[in-house]
């Protein structure tokens, strides 16, 4: 095994030059264990590494901290293994942290391909798929969708699901598969080349763990059963993990995702909804909100049944969500600035008090102020 097998490239090598002079080694993070990280170096040796205080305190947000898939600089000694720096990410798939906080959650760093696993049954949701496509577009990775468990549905149902997903994003590669039967996986395997990083996302119970087992060639994970009543599966992946596949390629597996919350901007959203963006160029007003505005070409297309009402409503909903996110981020930034200003005042006051105290402790002859 070499660094190239782990996804190393010339850009990482150039950035790492200064760290190499310090005697540190490049490593890719396999796992985040909360208090430590699993890290793999070029010769295949795995280390349990801790984060240096400098890296921790220089991170402005949790998203700036190392995550699974990141490249880091390891300081390896007899006593411990310390992460001294994180290299710049070349791509990053992330979402807004669930809840009301304005925080980014990194799902996988430095990924080339994001594979969304779904099925033609209870998990099928075009609205959720639109969210996935928007986040994948922002990440810079290649979008791939697996309509899995084809053995449980008719050919017509699988074909319809695949066609509807393809219509949302003509650039995405959509494949109909059955991991259990081993059908439809040839196209996916062709993506798994040396140094290429692929991450799996999707709901619980859609077959991600079974796919990992098949790609690794053994029963790597326990695979949960799906409730026949609800159609939902139990989580079989409890933490994100990066794995080097036997036949080449790198796989980052993720626990089932329940909430696909936006972490992006309006520009990325419009790029993901190119059909609406092209229509908006025909609107009467440049700042048309595509609501009740006069001369809205987008709403006109909906009325003429040239644009799906569901897609139109989905766009408006995501636009509102992104606007809400922007307000949350602005509010959070103001809070951080106030906190920083307060901390600065406290430090200044403490320094002044300390200097005054030291002045009082000096011998009287040294207290004269010149």
What are these regions (language model features)?
Residues 1-25:
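Short boundary/loop segments of OB/S1/cold-shock single-stranded nucleic-acid-binding domains
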Residues 2-3, 20, 42, 60-71, ...:
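Helix-rich effector regions associated with P-loop NTPase G domains
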Residues 23-35:
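Structural detector for short beta-strands of small beta-barrel domains
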Residues 37-42, 49, 74, 83:
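SH3/SH3-like beta-barrel fold
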Residues 46-65:
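Beta-strand/loop nucleic-acid-binding surfaces
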Residues 77-94, 110-130, 144, 151-156, ...:
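Conserved Switch II/interswitch segment of TRAFAC-class P-loop GTPases
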Residues 142, 151-206:
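Canonical P-loop GTPase G-domain recognition
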Residues 208-224:
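A conserved segment at the C-terminal end of the G1
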